[in-house]
Amino acid sequence: MDAIKKKMQAMKLEKDNAMDRALLCEQQARDANIRAEKAEEEARSLQKKIQQIENDLDQTMEQLMQVNAKLDEKDKALQNAESEVAALNRRIQLLEEDLERSEERLATATAKLAEASQAADESERARKILESKGLADEERMDALENQLKEARFMAEEADKKYDEVARKLAMVEADLERAEERAETGESKIVELEEELRVVGNNLKSLEVSEEKANLREEEYKQQIKTLNTRLKEAEARAEFAERSVQKLQKEVDRLEDELVHEKEKYKYICDDLDMTFTELIGN
């Protein structure tokens, strides 16, 4: 009887130990499940962060492409502005050359007119001198008449030359007026061109400032891309570590569940053994 009691006490102690181990296994399994759930939650959070970083990277790349496109447009605008400035400079040079030629033609016509006027004045003075003298001498009269004829001829020639010069002078004056109008137009155009050049210069300065700002933004975008790539790699590494941790915890959970099943089977075996022992005691 004492042996049976000792055996029952030993079996009860073993049962209690099995129960304690089973409870411990269950607690360890619950703890492992909690750690696994936390690891999975952290993995999901990391996945969301990775997705957000990838979206930020795509947005930054798109902004960088837009900045590069704007820089290309500004480069084209700058080239067009430089071409316009060169064309305006050529037009100004042509206007200045045309004005110089008109001034030279005006000076030549003025000199010819002065010569013709001087010749006409000299002929008129000679004619008046011949008329005032009233020479009685026939030969002298003939000579004077001849001189007068010559003077008249010279005067007529001078008049013709004067008319020709006057006609040419009128043409020159008309050309001069047109040249002056063109000069005034050219001056106005020069003022406009200078204003356009000033505006183009300001635009060029603005483009240079915009280009510097665009370069700074491009450097900032590159730095952001670099930072995002670094964060992406870190997040991927953490995600991989979390996945490995989840797998490790899952293996631990599986092991504890197997151990729990084994302890439950052992506990069942002890209970069955106790039942058999009680049955034997009752039967005896």
UniProtKB/Swiss-Prot annotation:
Record key words, sorted: Coiled coil, Repeat
Coiled-coil segments on the chain, per record: 1-284
Pfam families assigned: Tropomyosin
InterPro entries: Tropomyosin
Domain notes: The molecule is in a coiled coil structure that is formed by 2 polypeptide chains. The sequence exhibits a prominent seven-residues periodicity.
Oligomer status and interactors: Homodimer.
Protein name: Tropomyosin
Organism: Blattella germanica
